[in-house]
Amino acid sequence: TGHMLLVDEFISLNASTDFKEMFFVVIQLGAILAVVTIFWNKMWPFQLKDKTQPVMKKDTWSMWFKTVVACIPGAIVTILFDNYIEAHLHTAVVIAIALIFYGIAFIVIENWNKTRTPKVETLNDITYKTAFLIGMFQVLSIIPGTSRSGATIIGALLIGVSRVAAAEFTFFLAVPVMFGLSALKMIKFGLSFTSAEFAILIIGCVVAYLVSIVVIKFLMSYIKKHDFKIFGWYRIVLGVIVLAYFALFA
């Protein structure tokens, strides 16, 4: 969302402010469908026995219950403060500061983790307590530029979750979170679209889906052999560029 808000500062979408606020959230459903596509086998809680009889996968059901627990803190904070955040913090400067701050956090935490062995190696090792703690970190993502996935991954790394398990649980969390946020934004917008607005939403979702398929596959392959420091440096550089631009030209 932070990236989209920044792009809108330079190439503004020709639409009402209310529609853009809804659009920046709802098109991320395309990214969520990409997550479901890639992680279908892990996310779908049923499997066929002898190709005819469906059998429940207990580990998958358990992971979804943990996901619900992790979503509770963020849901409460979003309902209480979403309007305030939209009105006061959706600015390029706030986004840039958040980019830099959490970029530094990624680098510091990865350096600290060099001497630590993860306590939680796999997705199924995540407990309800761990899930709730990760959910508390997800609350930070209500600040534009923080990155929901960045906040949850940083939180997971801090409490001893491996990189791969942290990323996978973040993707689990994304499904109910983004569906919930999208529903909230659409209800606030009024569920009334012009044909042009509807077309913009569909195109945005399709593009988000296609790009996300490539990015998620790359990310999961990359973190099996590397840490997150490169993403930290990227955030810092982008944040500095944005601050410099608005200091000089705004």
What is each PLM-predicted segment?
Residues 1-250:
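Multi-pass membrane proteins that catalyze or facilitate reactions on polyprenyl-/lipid-phosphate substrates
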